[in-house]
């Protein structure tokens, strides 16, 4: 099974229960954050480590985009990277792709864009 590197910002991660894949989750909202782009609503800390004690969760960079978490993973694990890594946002299934498409492609062994053209 492919390894999941997940960048989460105030996301519900219940969907991960269905996938036995090894993973790491970078919690971008571990210290709190903003609910929207205009910084009008402050979010409390996500407490993902308490919500999901079985998950492998670490603090993400609250100032960077999801790509900063992916690069952190690559740099920190450069000498021992998994054979295949899926770089995901915490809301991938609910926002970017339908679950049935995700299930069909998620353990591919070659580059596969995670997109669902019919979902938009």
Residue ranges and their predicted role:
Residues 1-120:
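ER/Golgi luminal nucleotide-sugar-dependent glycosyltransferases, focusing on the catalytic module
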């Amino acid at each position: 099974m492919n390894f999941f590197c997940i960048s989460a910002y105030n996301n519900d991660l219940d969907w991960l229960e269905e996938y036995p894949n090894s993973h790491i989750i970078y919690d971008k909202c571990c210290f709190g954050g903003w609910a929207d782009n205009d910084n009008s609503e402050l979010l409390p800390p996500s407490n993902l480590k308490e919500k999901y004690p079985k998950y492998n969760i670490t603090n993400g960079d609250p100032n960077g985009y999801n790509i900063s978490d992916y690069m952190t993973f690559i740099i920190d694990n450069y000498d021992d990277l998994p054979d295949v890594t899926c770089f995901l946002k915490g809301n991938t299934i609910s926002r970017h792709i339908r679950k049935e498409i995700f299930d069909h492609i998620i353990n591919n062994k070659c580059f596969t864009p995670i997109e669902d053209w019919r979902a938009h």
